[in-house]
Structure formats: C-alpha cells, structure tokens
Design a protein with these regions (language model features):
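Short, small/acidic-rich helices and loops at N termini and domain boundaries
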Residues: 1-54
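Glycine-biased, small-residue-rich flexible motifs in mid-sequence functional cores and linkers
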Residues: 45, 50-265
Length: 265
C-alpha cells in the first residue's frame, strides 16, 4: 500500500498503477525506485528533490512524514510560524492576517502558509511587505501555481529568498484530496500555528488539529459567535488554543515559546 501511495504522490497515471498492480509487488517497487531518481524523472529547472534523509527536522519526527519533498528556493532554518485560515475570509480577517504576517515576518520568524486565496495569501503578503521570509506549501507540484491568480505572489516569495515546497511531483495538478496531505506539512514545518478565521469544517481547522497532534503550539483569533468563519477559532480557544488579543501579545507569546525573536536578515 505504501508503494502505491508513493506512485500516486509522484504523479503516476492511475491506469499505469493498475497495470503495475496486476504485474505484482516487485513491478510496483521497481517503478517507485525509478520515480525517485530526480535526474531522470524531473529535469525541471530550479526544482530540488529532498529524500527522506534530507527532510527538515520538523518533518522527520512526524509519524506520517512525507517520503520526500520537492523544493524551489530555500527552506528557512530555525523556528517558523504558520498562519492559516479561511479562503473566504472577511475583510477584517484579511486585514488581520496581513498584519499578523507583517508582525511575524518583521520579527524575523519565517511565515509558513499554503498560498491559497484568503488568509494564506494575506499572511504571505504581509510578511513580504516587511522584508520577511515566506514558505509556501502547495497541494500541487511546485511548478503548478494554484490558484493561478497567486502566481506572482509565489514568484515574489522566491525572489525574496523564501521557498515553495510540495511532496507532489512537478506537473501534478491540485485535487481536493491532496490538500489534507499538504496541511500536515504546513504544521510540521512550523513551531507555532496561528489560525485566523476558520469554519467548523475547514482545512485551517484540520491544520490546527494536526499541529496539536504534532506537539506544536496553536493560537487563534477570537471572533463573532454568530459568524461562520469564527466558529472554528472559537472552538480552538475553548479547547485550549491561546487567544490572540493584541499583536503585542502575539509576539510576547511566541517569544515565550520560542525564545527572543531573531534579528531579521
């Protein structure tokens, strides 16, 4: 089963996977071995292949660690902070996500998110505005921008010294089932996860629950009890997430967990 999942992550055609299954386990494992050779499989300029032994420490400790990563740009070293939330964020949520991105990035912590519409993009934007370092984790190949409207944002992340990463091979297009896989990498690469607006059933809430399971610290923005995009955050706070009441409180709390904010390069 693990080998078949590897082939799916690497982008093998479903028909080819079925033919390999009929051919037997040795055929499947042989195909996986050949797929893992980036020199023959992914001659894509600017894309690096990290094997399991080369993964960042935050990922190697996960029980469901990715078998590899594809990387464009650089993966920042040191503690990072993830900022996630609704794709359909309110104007308030978007502005706050941007301010949080500015505050975290300006304090020297890399900002990790998913390059999605809404909160993700706003947090990345805020980080870049102050010269911070951003890291985007995609639910597609690292050469496939999703959504396409955020392509320029992704390029700016690379131009500013940040990175784009994915466990899915180059050329793989986004599909709904890929995003929960992506979310565990977002939380795994971060020491603290901040949730800005999240519905009760949302990818951001999945990321927060994964963060708790991974032993990460979780913070959430309290919101209007009658607003759908606030329900997830309010539930997280009820269950023990640290509420964000001011941006000064945000920095002080992160420093309590991670130590003094690093100097921004």
């Amino acid at each position: 089963m693990s080998a078949l999942l590897d082939l799916a992550l690497l982008g093998s055609n479903p028909d080819r996977i079925r033919r390999l299954m009929l051919a037997g386990e040795s055929a499947v494992r042989s195909e996986v071995a050949s797929c893992r050779d980036p020199s023959t499989r992914w001659p894509v300029d600017g894309v690096r292949f990290l094997s399991a032994d080369e993964l960042p420490a935050g990922l190697t400790s996960l029980p469901d660690a990715p078998p590899w990563l594809f990387v464009r740009g650089a993966i920042p070293t040191g503690p990072a902070v993830a900022v996630v939330g609704s794709r359909r964020a309110t104007r308030y949520g978007l502005e706050l996500a941007r301010r949080i991105g500015r505050t975290v990035g300006g304090s020297g912590w890399p900002v990790v998110s998913g390059l999605a519409l809404g909160v993700d993009a706003a947090a990345h934007e805020g980080c870049l505005e102050v010269g911070g370092t951003a890291l985007a984790v995609l639910g597609s190949g690292v050469d496939v921008w999703y959504p396409r409207s955020n392509r320029r944002l992704g390029e700016r992340i690379l131009e500013s010294g940040g990175g784009i990463v994915s466990e899915f091979g180059p050329g793989i297009t986004p599909e709904p089932w890929r995003f929960p896989f992506r979310n565990r990498i977002i939380s795994g690469l971060a020491s603290v996860v901040i949730v800005v607006e999240a519905a009760v059933r949302s990818g951001a809430l999945i990321t927060a629950h994964l963060a708790v399971a991974q032993g990460r610290e979780v913070m959430a923005v309290p919101g209007d009890i009658d607003r759908a995009t606030s329900v997830g955050c309010n539930l997280l706070i009820r269950d023990g997430a640290h509420p964000i009441t001011t941006l000064d409180d945000l920095v002080e709390t992160i420093e309590f967990w991670l130590g003094p904010a690093p100097a921004r390069p």
